[in-house]
């Protein structure tokens, strides 16, 4: 208990003899110099005064968010409005309130360029009024008393105004306005004051300078700021400027007068497609000798010496190891009058979907057949890919064909063998829909390079063949009419992440044209983005047109939302996305009749989508298109019918009558092509 007594009897007053001053680091009793205290001691009494933090005003934010809701708009119109606002914000920044921008967009019916012009015109009028008032007040001060040399420096001296010069009738912004040179604004003359002399002297000297400049350079005149503001500074390319570009003239200028042609090489597996085109590229100089020597050495080590030229187009290790093309290889070469985009399609039956992707992007085709005994028959008879490839390219819109009868050196350039092959193939191609005048037959040898870029000098061939070589036949193809004037359409064939911001897509522009800075809409994801860059044949360009195979760098969209098969279009004229549509189809050779509920694989451009035939509407006459039978129970080979299809996921389609390139598709079942069709009606 002794400890408790000690605690109870403790005198606490001894601990509180002095008051503690918490506002100081040490007590005043300690001796310390003022300099040391100022250096090491902190005093709250000397704390600097801090202004109260200004609270953020959220009223303006609420007003801007509610400004759109005040206007009763549909969901689609709201999306268009937000898109227009984003575009205008990129040009104007935050200088103009949202309400003014919204009113301008609605007043001009969602036309961004007209709305921008209206807002800029309104700002110009207001700024001119302010300048006029400032001019009048400055004139009054000048008449009253001379301006002191120290106070006469106006804002126009500190921040020089840009003066617009007219050179030979063209408006160009050239330099800054020199102090002392007058510029007329809205009928009032404003003179920048100078140091030293009064304003009257400055006016006199400026008049002398102005007359001297006019006499020395008559075509060069300083325009009023009204002309400058009537054509606002192009912060971003406007749609009006883009529409003024003559795309056809620019296209010819870019290609040096040569026309663009997309060529696909098709044929049965092991017919020699890659070797034929690889050797042609080497002879044209597209592949240097050092690279070709490297391919020859590597192919010899792999035990595939005859595949050296094929390795020019078969770039992946798996393709070189197996000796089979698996994906579409793409490259470029030039002829006398054409710029050719070459697509080497796979010939193996397992890779028909990839072949359809390449053929859907082609304008013309080269069909390669093997002239060896037994090989041509194997590829041409049932189960071979020669027939199927010929039907596919014709169904996908290819009307011009060059048939390269390859490996003729293995049959000693026999004329009888060549005529036998051309007779069988010519009859089949005529049935498939090719005109005789649009089909050419050329005897070639891909390994030796005979009759590829120059006419053969071999006596065994020249004694009976006097026709064109393969390159001359390709050069004689007629390029199709490009849909440059139609709305922009691009089908995605590949998506990948590149260095830097955004991501890249590749594909062929089917219609219209595009420039950097354009906004695009992706369907069916229904997402918008901006074109940051355009690459054509591995070279950056500012624009591209229909027929070009391009790579676009996009920003403002997540890469996860874009898949192979998506179609990019302009936001003003979007493409429709649906799961149900009606189509007119032509049935090929099938063993099982097509009935209601028949499952198929739909191949459309770069899309491969499972589908079901929901309805058999009618059977049509092949020639006239008239209905011969309504609501048939089944369809057999050779019939032309109107059916309704339904896909599992939405796909972006166009009617065949509007866009022929985007209105064709193929139907496959069980590893073989059973029908080709065109879209006639799109259901919701």
Swiss-Prot record:
Catalysed reactions listed for this entry: GTP + H2O = GDP + phosphate + H(+)
Residues the entry annotates as binding GTP: 267-274, 406-409, 445-447
Region called G2, residue ranges: 323-327
Top-tier EC class: hydrolase
SUPFAM superfamilies: EF-Tu/eEF-1alpha/eIF2-gamma C-terminal domain, HBS1-like domain, P-loop containing nucleoside triphosphate hydrolases, Translation proteins
Subunit structure: Component of the Pelota-HBS1L complex, also named Dom34-Hbs1 complex, composed of PELO and HBS1L. Interacts with the SKI complex.
Function text: GTPase component of the Pelota-HBS1L complex, a complex that recognizes stalled ribosomes and triggers the No-Go Decay (NGD) pathway. The Pelota-HBS1L complex recognizes ribosomes stalled at the 3' end of an mRNA and engages stalled ribosomes by destabilizing mRNA in the mRNA channel. Following mRNA extraction from stalled ribosomes by the SKI complex, the Pelota-HBS1L complex promotes recruitment of ABCE1, which drives the disassembly of stalled ribosomes, followed by degradation of damaged mRNAs as part of the NGD pathway.
Name of the protein: HBS1-like protein
UniProt source species: Homo sapiens (Human)
Gene encoding the protein: HBS1L
């Amino acid at each position: 208990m002794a400890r408790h007594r000690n605690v109870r009897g403790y005198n606490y007053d001894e601990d509180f003899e002095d008051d503690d001053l918490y506002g100081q680091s040490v007590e005043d009793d300690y001796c310390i110099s003022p300099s040391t205290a100022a250096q090491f001691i902190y005093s709250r009494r000397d704390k600097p005064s801090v202004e109260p933090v200004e609270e953020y005003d959220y009223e303006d934010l609420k007003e801007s968010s509610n400004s759109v809701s005040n206007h009763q708009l549909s969901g689609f119109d709201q999306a268009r409005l937000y898109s227009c606002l984003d575009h205008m914000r990129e040009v104007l920044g935050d200088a103009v309130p949202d309400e003014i921008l919204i009113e301008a967009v609605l007043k001009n019916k969602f036309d961004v360029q007209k709305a921008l012009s209206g807002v800029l015109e309104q700002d110009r009028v207001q700024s001119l009024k302010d300048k006029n008032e400032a001019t009048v007040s400055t004139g009054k001060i000048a008449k009253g008393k001379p301006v002191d040399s120290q106070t006469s420096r106006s804002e126009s001296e500190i921040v020089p105004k840009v003066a617009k010069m007219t050179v030979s009738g063209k408006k160009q912004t050239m330099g800054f306005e020199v102090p002392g040179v007058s510029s007329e604004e809205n009928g009032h003359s404003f003179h920048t004051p100078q140091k030293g002399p009064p304003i009257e002297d400055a006016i006199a000297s400026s008049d002398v300078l102005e007359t001297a400049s006019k006499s020395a350079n008559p075509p060069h005149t300083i325009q009023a700021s009204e002309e400058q503001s009537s054509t606002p500074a192009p912060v971003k390319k406007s749609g009006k400027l883009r529409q003024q570009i003559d795309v056809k003239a620019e296209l010819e200028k870019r290609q040096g007068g040569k026309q663009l042609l997309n060529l696909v090489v098709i044929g049965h597996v092991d017919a020699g497609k890659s070797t034929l085109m690889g050797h042609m590229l080497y002879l044209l100089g597209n592949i240097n000798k050092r690279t070709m020597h490297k391919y020859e050495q590597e192919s010899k080590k792999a035990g595939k010496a005859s595949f050296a030229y094929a390795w020019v187009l078969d770039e992946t290790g798996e393709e070189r190891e197996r000796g089979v093309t698996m994906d579409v290889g793409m490259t470029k070469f030039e002829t006398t009058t054409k710029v050719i985009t070459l697509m080497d399609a796979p010939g193996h039956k397992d890779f028909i979907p990839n072949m359809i992707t390449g053929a859907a992007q082609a304008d013309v085709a080269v069909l390669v057949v093997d002239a060896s005994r037994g090989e041509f028959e194997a590829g041409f008879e049932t189960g071979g890919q020669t027939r199927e490839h010929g039907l596919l390219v014709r169904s996908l819109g290819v009307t011009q064909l060059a048939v390269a009868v390859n490996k003729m050196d293995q049959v000693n350039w026999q004329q009888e063998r060549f005529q036998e092959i051309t007779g069988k193939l010519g009859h089949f191609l005529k049935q498939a829909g090719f005109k005789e005048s649009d089909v050419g037959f050329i005897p070639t040898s891909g390994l030796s390079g005979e009759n590829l870029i120059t006419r053969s000098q071999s006596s065994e061939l020249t004694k009976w063949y006097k026709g064109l070589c393969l390159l001359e036949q390709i050069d004689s193809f007629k390029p199709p009419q490009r849909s440059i004037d139609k709305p922009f359409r691009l089908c995605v064939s590949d998506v990948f992440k590149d260095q830097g911001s955004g991501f890249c897509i590749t594909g062929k522009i089917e219609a219209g044209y595009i420039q950097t800075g354009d906004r695009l809409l992706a369907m069916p994801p229904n997402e918008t983005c901006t074109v940051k860059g355009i690459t054509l044949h591995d070279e950056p360009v500012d624009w591209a047109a229909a027929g070009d195979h391009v790579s676009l760098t996009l920003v403002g969209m997540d890469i996860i939302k874009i898949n192979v098969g998506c179609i990019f279009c302009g936001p003003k004229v979007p493409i429709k996305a649906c799961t149900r549509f009606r189509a007119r189809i032509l049935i090929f050779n099938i063993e099982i009749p097509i009935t209601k509920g028949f499952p198929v694989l739909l191949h459309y451009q770069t899309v491969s989508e499972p589908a079901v035939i929901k309805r058999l509407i009618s059977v049509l006459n092949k020639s006239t298109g008239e209905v011969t039978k309504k609501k048939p129970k089944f369809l057999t080979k050779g019939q032309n019918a109107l059916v309704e299809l339904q896909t599992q996921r939405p796909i972006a389609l166009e009617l065949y009558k509007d866009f022929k390139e985007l209105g064709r598709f193929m139907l496959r079942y069980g590893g073989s092509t059973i029908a080709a069709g065109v879209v006639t009606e799109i259901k919701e």
